[in-house]
Amino acid sequence: MMDVSDTYILPVVGYRVWVLREGKVFSYAVDNFWIPKRANVAQCGGYEHVKFWGPHKIQSGPKLIPHASYSAPLAECGCGFYAFRTLPYLMEWLEHREESNIVVGEVYLWGKIVDCQYGYRAQYAYPKRFYSNSYEYNYAYNNSTVALREFNVPVEPMPETVGQPEFVYEP
């Protein structure tokens, strides 16, 4: 795990979850919606701390340090677009969640990227692919599917073989 962020011109691919609400695609942990057909740009919210959930308990995340939005993400801060390095890591993270209307997928990350233990935090992000096992997402046309299709990326079935890695928490 690096303590510094690097700038990437070519995208890194990660895995993340979104929420479908009000006919839009929202971030899971932060109340902002993703804009179709253009890069989504990270900004620091200046919160005291973020919450992230391990497989068994809620833990405090990194402190957010207010700074200029153009410098997001800072390695010392908790801002940026989050993505897991692997789909199995994401699936384990989701294991204890019961929210409805979630969508799992791949995301392109580029610009300033902070390498974290299980994934990345990035300056820019855009969906690469949405996964769904649901007939509704794949074939029906309603507010949810229209919201996904506006991104002009594939909506595909979830890969059938997704191993479940064990998270290892560092004290």
Can you name each region flagged by the protein language model?
Residues 1-61, 79, 91-171:
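Conserved NAD+-utilizing ADP-ribose enzyme module
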